[in-house]
């Protein structure tokens, strides 16, 4: 099954013959998945403006125009079910299973650009028929994230808190601050720090970078919205930790690696703008391809990031500027000793990317605006 953002879904056999096609608009960030003989994706009704921006004029659109999950029959392309609770186009939708065997997914509503889906908050959807099991209203919720289950509990971030929600009833069980007096370690110091930080900066409704979160074992990792910091919440104990990281690596042949750190001095550029050199946004043919000035920036702060990926004991955290952090996710303390390596996907300014890393047969696969990349071990 192939899908594009121009309004077409098509299914082909392995010889390339078209089996079926449908004219239907999908969210350009959709993460479709197969469930049995069904193809599940995020369906959208209204398109963005020609400049790629979604205007606020749809904020009061009726339910028929809401963004929804939709399941198609893989054999025919017919609609099997469509949700009614609505979800935000920025959701990273992940199918999961409750302990009673039900296949479910958590979806969220709320965010920037005036999305019409209401109420703001999250819902648990039964993937058997698309029905809503429960909904939890969360006023002011920023839903551009992924939601995972841990022992039948939903783990999510809301404003300055980490919430654990009962996956059976939809009731909030715990609420833990991720911004008030949090232990913070410095990358340059290979030890656990006694420093704490308060991250309540301005009136931000978001406190994590969009779609930067990933639940790995008992740790819920995320990137801060206001600092170049990697954070994690221990969902069993409620412990929160931060590790201050470099903004970007500047690695060049025959020279020692250099790191760019966040400049907080008066008159310094915003976090999202600080780079070794701005991204050129040139593709493999030399054409400049972008519609948002943030694309030239650091990949920290007000952007939608690639979701981290786990392979074995390592968490791979890619940043839009081409830098990739490799973290030992199960480290007892989130400090510099948990950092396995920092590397890049190419030279600074020429390695823009917004995709997660993929893994197969011991190799890492990535792509930037210019290249497809396969990384293998020296032993291979």
Feature names for model-found ranges:
Residues 1-380:
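Noncatalytic, solvent-exposed loop/strand surfaces
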């Amino acid at each position: 099954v192939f899908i594009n953002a121009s309004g077409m879904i098509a299914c082909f056999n392995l010889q390339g013959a078209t089996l079926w096609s449908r004219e239907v608009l999908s969210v350009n960030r959709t993460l479709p998945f197969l469930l049995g003989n069904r193809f599940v994706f995020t369906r959208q009704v209204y398109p963005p403006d020609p400049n790629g921006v979604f205007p606020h004029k749809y904020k009061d659109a009726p339910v028929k125009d809401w963004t929804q999950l939709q399941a198609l029959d893989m054999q025919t392309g017919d609609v099997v079910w469509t949700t009614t609770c609505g979800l935000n186009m920025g959701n990273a939708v992940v199918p999961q299973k409750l302990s009673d065997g039900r296949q479910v997914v958590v979806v969220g509503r709320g965010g920037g650009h005036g999305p019409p889906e209401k109420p703001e908050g999250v819902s648990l959807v039964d993937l058997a028929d698309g029905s809503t099991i429960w909904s939890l209203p969360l006023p002011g919720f920023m839903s551009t994230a992924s939601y995972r289950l841990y022992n039948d509990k939903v783990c999510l971030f809301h404003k300055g808190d980490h919430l654990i929600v009962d996956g059976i009833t939809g009731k909030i069980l715990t609420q833990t601050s991720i911004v008030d007096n949090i232990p913070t370690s410095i990358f340059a110091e290979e030890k656990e720090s006694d420093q704490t930080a308060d991250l309540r900066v301005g009136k931000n409704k978001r406190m994590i970078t969009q779609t930067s979160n990933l639940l790995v074992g008992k740790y819920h990792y995320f990137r801060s919205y206001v600092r170049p910091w990697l954070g994690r919440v221990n969902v069993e104990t409620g412990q929160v930790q931060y590790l201050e990281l470099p903004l970007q690596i500047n690695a060049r042949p025959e020279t020692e690696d250099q790191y760019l750190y966040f400049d907080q001095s008066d008159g310094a550029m915003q976090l999202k703008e600080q780079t070794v050199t701005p991204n050129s946004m040139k593709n493999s043919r030399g054409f400049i391809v972008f519609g948002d000035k943030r694309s030239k920036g650091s990949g920290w702060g007000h952007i939608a990031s690639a979701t981290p990926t786990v392979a074995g004991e390592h968490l791979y955290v890619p940043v839009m500027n081409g830098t990739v952090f490799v973290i030992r996710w199960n480290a007892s303390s989130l400090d510099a000793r948990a950092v396995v390596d920092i590397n890049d996907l190419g030279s600074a300014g020429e390695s823009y990317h917004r995709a997660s890393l993929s893994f197969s047969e011991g190799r890492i696969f990535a792509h930037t605006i210019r290249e497809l990349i396969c990384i293998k071990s020296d032993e291979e």
